[in-house]
UniProtKB/Swiss-Prot annotation:
Pfam families: DUF3719 (PF12516). One of its GO terms (cellular component) is cilium. Its main location: other. Belongs to the FAM149 family. This is Primary cilium assembly protein FAM149B1. PANTHER family: AGAP003710-PA, PRIMARY CILIUM ASSEMBLY PROTEIN FAM149B1. Residues 43-53 have a biased composition (Basic and acidic residues). Involved in the localization of proteins to the cilium and cilium assembly. Indirectly regulates the signaling functions of the cilium, being required for normal SHH/smoothened signaling and proper development. Interacts with TBC1D32; may play a role in cilium assembly. Residues 54-74, 524-542, 557-567 have a biased composition (Polar residues).
Length: 578
């Protein structure tokens, strides 16, 4: 047994030189070849002789000195299988004979099939094959052999015959007599993915049990729940619509399936091409309109007219009229802007916007301007009536002062300018005129111990400061002449006295009281004379000399202007230096 593993395969050249006799001595030849050939002759003489001739021609040992039968029997497996080591094995003779018999039978079967299909020759094997095919067709109706296979089948596809006579039931029943043997193909049951396809009744086999047209719904055995996820191009849409093809088509479009059919592809391409052209034109028109509108708002009137003019040669410009350019707003409806830079910017900012819009040219007014005008007009009516100054009590003044102080300075000056033609600013008073309007004994009294009391009362303003708005009784001209004669006696005086003299003189009668309160830069400062207990004398000083305030302000020099300016900002602290 050990020597089996040391043997090598005998080459073909050595076998041809005479080693076959040595192999024959160890393995005597049994006479079985004649028995095999006799069994083949019982089935058909022509088939066995033809198969033996084919095997003999294919055998590579036909050139040996021995006969054809001896060479095949010496190496039976080499002629059939090609394994050369089986000739030297003790147990290989039986295996080789079985392989040889099986090979010869299969080869004879294929030869008979080829003769039947291509040469129309009938034999014993061919008759057996026909009976077997009929049994297969009756037992397995889903797969039948009809003829020649044209294309390679794939899952989900079916082959259609060239003529309807090829799939008739009579041809299936009598397959060996009536069917066309030149056509070879595989026909099976088609999966009905489309609802428009109606299965033909000729597809059903004759040997099947009558199911009544529900062959696809027949369930042989089922257990449990099976879920299948299939992906295919076309869905059965008539299950929910019951034959309404229009609703099925609309529902298919809503499902979002990609356009597979050539018609849908062409439709989508045409729509995309048309949409691109229309959208490009629409974007061009919108670009022209937007550019003309916004550039017109940012530029002045002359450049605005040039930019907003439509270009007739542009392909994106529609046939429409030019935008309406509204006229300028009359100056009577525009508030005065000469005194306030903020109002000038606001009024000039509205003018370019009007030219590009189809709106009425109304200048925007501030929110508090109408309220201020109403309050100021109410004050004018109350002041012009006799005895109406007492109506302006302390409960109205502080609230209105807080409300009007938050507004802009330009709005107050504009409303005052419309009512008061004279200038609003208070120019500094010269020293000579200020001395002429204030008596000397009053200045000596103001220098006294009343200054600390004034500093204390300025921290919390007293309602007595509003008392000078009341109407004053008339004063005789004798006292006026006496006081005017006493004025020029003291021409040289300090700046503190000049400020007191200026504070003793009331502003112009046309100037309103609220302007003096809200405009501290342009009005005179509060002094200690406002808090004197002698109201009668203070009122006489305030009302007797309105004619001396104007020439004093008009002839003021730069020296007096510089001296009074810091005093008006400093308050009572700067007046106590002397």
């Amino acid at each position: 047994m050990i020597s089996r593993y040391t043997r090598k395969a005998v080459p073909q050249s050595v076998e041809l030189k005479g080693l076959t006799k040595h192999a024959l001595n160890h393995h005597p030849l049994p006479e079985r070849l004649d028995d095999i050939s006799s069994t083949n002759n019982s089935h058909g003489k022509d088939t066995s002789s033809h198969s033996e001739s084919d095997i003999t021609q294919e055998s590579p040992i036909t050139s040996t000195d021995t006969g054809n039968s001896n060479s095949r029997s010496a190496f039976p497996s080499y002629a059939g299988t090609g394994v050369s080591t089986e000739g030297s094995s003790d147990f290989s003779w039986g295996y080789g004979e079985l392989d040889q018999n099986a090979t010869e039978k299969v080869q004879a079967m294929f030869t008979a099939i080829d003769e039947l299909l291509y040469e129309q020759q009938l034999s014993a094997h061919t008759q057996g094959l026909q009976k077997e095919c009929q049994q297969w067709a009756a037992s397995f109706p889903h797969l039948r052999i009809l003829g020649r296979q044209i294309i390679t089948p794939s899952e989900g596809y079916g082959l259609y015959p060239r003529s309807p006579s090829a799939v008739s039931a009579s041809h299936e029943a009598t397959l060996s007599q009536e069917r066309e043997s030149t056509i070879f193909g595989i026909r099976g049951k088609k999966l009905h993915f489309s609802s428009s396809y109606k299965p033909s009744p000729t597809i059903k086999a004759s040997g099947l049990c009558a199911v009544g047209g529900e062959e696809a719904d027949c369930i042989i055995f089922s257990e449990g729940v099976i879920e299948e996820y299939l992906a295919f191009d076309h869905t059965d849409m008539e299950e929910g619509f019951h034959g309404n093809k229009s609703e099925a088509a609309t529902e298919k479009q809503k499902l979002g399936y990609p356009p597979i059919a050539p018609f849908h592809c062409m439709k989508e391409d045409v729509l995309a091409h048309v949409f691109d052209n229309v959208w490009s034109k629409a974007v061009g028109c919108m670009e022209q309109l937007t550019r003309s509108h916004w550039e017109g708002c940012a530029s002045d009137d002359e450049s605005n007219v040039e930019i907003t003019r439509l270009d007739s040669g542009s392909p994106y410009v529609l046939n429409e009229q030019h935008p309406l350019v509204l006229p300028r707003v009359p100056q009577s409806k525009v508030p005065s802007i000469t005194s306030s830079p903020m109002s000038f910017c606001q009024a000039s900012g509205h003018q370019p916007n009007v030219s590009g819009l189809l709106i009425h040219g109304m200048p925007l007014q501030p929110r508090n301007l109408s309220l201020m005008d109403k309050l100021l007009d109410l004050d004018d009516k109350l002041l012009t009536r006799p005895g109406s100054s007492s109506v302006l009590s302390n409960r109205n003044w502080p609230n209105r002062a807080m409300e009007l102080s938050t507004s802009s300075l330009s709005y107050t000056t504009q409303s005052a300018r419309r009512r008061n033609p004279p200038p609003r600013t208070l120019h500094p008073i010269s020293t000579s005129h200020s001395r002429a309007g204030t008596p000397w004994p009053v200045e000596e009294i103001l220098r006294g111990p009343r200054v600390p009391v004034t500093a204390d009362t300025l921290s919390s303003p007293s309602p007595m400061t509003l008392g000078r708005n009341n109407l004053l009784p008339p004063i005789g001209t004798v006292e006026v002449e006496h006081l005017s004669a006493m004025g020029p006696q003291r021409p040289t005086k300090s700046h503190g006295d000049s400020s007191r003299a200026r504070s003793a003189v009331v502003d112009e009668p046309n100037q309103q009281p609220q302007e003096r309160l809200l405009l501290p830069v342009f009005s005179r400062p509060n002094t200690t004379q406002s808090f004197l207990p002698d109201t009668q004398y203070r009122s006489s000083c305030a009302s007797e000399y309105p004619h001396q305030a104007r020439p004093g302000r008009g002839s003021a020099g730069p020296q007096s202007h510089g001296s009074t300016k810091p005093q008006s900002r400093g308050g009572p602290i700067s007046r106590t230096r002397q």
